[in-house]
Amino acid sequence: FYAALLGWEVVFSDGDWACLGAPGAAQGAYPGITFQQNPAYLPPVWPEEPAAQQQMAHLDFAVDDLEGAVEYALHCGATEAAEQFSDGWRVMFDPAGHPFCLCAMKPVIESEHFALL
């Protein structure tokens, strides 16, 4: 799902583990995302509720065209959360039920005033 969504390459997959890399990146190069299969996985509850299964990680993807990105994510197999909290963000669920966000923040992130710590 994430390889299709991001246009990245599956650089390794053995059924239990999968590693994605940005196009043209050698295995082990960054950026990359590694996933582990978990047969006992339960999708997190979203929005979060006390004493309920919580997400272990959260991915936000900055995009140029929010509505186009939502349409593409749906095409790849995502679903849109029924509850949304902002016009500039869309909460989506991957096919396993894990939430991720698409956000119209790419111009901010790419500006000279933005820095990651």
Which residue ranges define each predicted feature?
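Terminal peptide-recognition signature
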Residues: 2
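Short hydrophobic/aromatic beta-strand micro-patches
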Residues: 60-62
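Vicinal oxygen chelate
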Residues: 8-58, 70-95, 105-117
